[in-house]
From Swiss-Prot:
Name of the protein in its database record: Small ribosomal subunit protein uS19
One Pfam family it belongs to: Ribosomal_S19
GO molecular function, one term: structural constituent of ribosome
Keywords recorded for this protein, A-Z: Ribonucleoprotein, Ribosomal protein, RNA-binding, rRNA-binding
Keyword Nucleotide-binding: no
PROSITE patterns reported in the protein's UniProt record: RIBOSOMAL_S19 (PS00323)
Swiss-Prot/TrEMBL GO biological process terms: ribosomal small subunit assembly; translation
Any one annotated GO CC term: cytoplasm
């Protein structure tokens, strides 16, 4: 379900302050996976927490409007079972 248009996009206030005061090339660490990517974020690198570590995410124009958490997967896919013991 989409967010109501009258509410507008969500971004954590502390994150927005960090972005405005950040220097070029600096990785901005954040736990706010739910924050929407704004046009002001383009060209910045965020360290998005996935529950274990910070995943570096470089923001491009195509990412505007999405959430930060979409680009830092929280689950590791181990793959499906092997056929090692199977005889033909």
């Amino acid at each position: 379900m989409a967010r109501s248009l009258k509410k507008g996009p969500f971004v954590d206030e502390n994150l927005f302050k960090k972005v405005t005061s950040a220097k070029d090339g600096e990785v901005i660490k954040t736990w706010s996976r739910r924050s929407t990517i704004f046009p002001e974020f383009i060209g910045k690198t965020f360290g998005v927490y996935n529950g274990k570590e910070f995943i570096p995410v470089y923001i491009t124009e195509d990412m505007v409007g999405n959430k930060l958490g979409e680009f830092a997967p929280t689950r590791k896919f181990g793959g499906h079972g092997d056929d090692k013991g199977k005889k033909k």
